[in-house]
Amino acid sequence: MSRWSTALQLTDIDDFITPSQICIKPVQIDKARSKTGAKIKIKGDSCFEESESGNLKLNKVDISLQDCLACSGCITSAEEVLITQQSQEELLKILQENSKNKASEDWDNVRTIVITLATQPLLSLAHRYQIGVEDAARHLNGYFRSLGADYVLSTKVADDIALLECRQEFVDRYRENENLTMLSSSCPGWVCYAEKTHGNFILPYVSTTRSPQQIMGVLVKQILADKINVPASRIYHVTVMPCYDKKLEASREDFFSKANNSRDVDCVITSVEVEQLLSEAQRPLSQYDLFDLDWPWSNVRPEFMVWAHEKTQSGGYAEHIFKFAAKHIFNEDLTTELEFKQLKNRDFREIILKQNGKTVLKFAIANGFRNIQNLVQKLKREKLSNYHFVEVMACPSGCINGGAQIRPTTGQHVRELTRKLEELYHNLPRSEPENSLTKHIYNDFLDGFQTDKSYEMLHTRYHDVVSDLSISLNINW
């Protein structure tokens, strides 16, 4: 399977949300209105031709990430648009500038560089370089420190907090019978699709809990900034993620702090981009020094820095929330690993809890755009009301098979690679989100659990993106 395509692929075998090369953002052309009319043609060489006035060369289209988020023309991110702030080149540029400022003792312009590593890229890199997952994290710390990074963190604490917030949000909705079916929100490709394609119909059902990436952004730019006494605007926060759509998520205006004049996440690079950086350095990951990941949140470090959450590889939302709801709503303590029933395909599964012969909880996992489209259509036909929660991920097999994970290099089929990564994930230690470390974060920095401050910092909102029918859908830049 190729990593890139010129259009969104929606076939049974290959329905990744791959970045699109087709963008419909129009060029504004200033011209006086003709009284008699004229024929207009945009030619292949970018010339704008009007029969009465000759040719006018069009300027190159400059498209920002904000344009992508506000545009209703395509479903998700664009590959060839001018994304200058979300690339490994930009990261290297910032690191080099920072090193020069340190060398010249220009302390006013020195930034604190923080790198956050998600679990799925660590699995991908560990498999690529044939090393352990924890060692992959430690070697990456060595690599980024060699470039000038100050802190290299894992997303563990943010993953834990996301589950705590999402499970409580579900229980509150269930008890109030409000906006069910609840749909997970950690996948930016799915959220972008929901905003642009279904808008206000679907958005009330989407969980308001921020994704682990954006929770990590809050922790770094507010809590870590306070702990190390550095203004948030002087921290450059980079995340390593398994999909390109995380770049769009980081660029949402909702995640820009006017008070701090900075984004929660400044730059997102992906697994495949890290591989490219290592390839350009002509040095495999295993040859970099081993450094333990940093843990600035408390004096007590966790035993491991890379953890699994339940059985599923996309954060464990469906399984964890199902267990929590069963216990706290129906007093059912489900201690064994849950088994989801496969429906039409391996990427659509469900699980049911019954009491006295009655279904009281019904959850599902829907991965891949084929299943997402079916899911939304069922909801529109009011046939989905018996699902209480659905974990939704845009990529088949979920985040472990994200569109920016390292692809097979030896003729290996993508599904075989996914199976190998799943094995690595299942061998990781399991994290229980409600632990002393997350309690410390809530009590010391968020005024406790379910407070106004915790809601403000850990939740977000979504926006109906209205289609502009004046834009032609057949303009390819």
Curated annotation (Swiss-Prot):
[4Fe-4S] cluster 1 binds at C23, C68, C71, C74. [4Fe-4S] cluster 2 binds at C187, C243, C395, C399. It comes from the Eukaryota. One of its GO terms (biological process) is iron-sulfur cluster assembly. The keyword 4Fe-4S applies. GO terms for molecular function: 4 iron, 4 sulfur cluster binding; metal ion binding. Transmembrane segments: none annotated. Disulfide bonds: none annotated. Belongs to the NARF family. This is Probable cytosolic Fe-S cluster assembly factor GM20417. It comes from Drosophila sechellia.
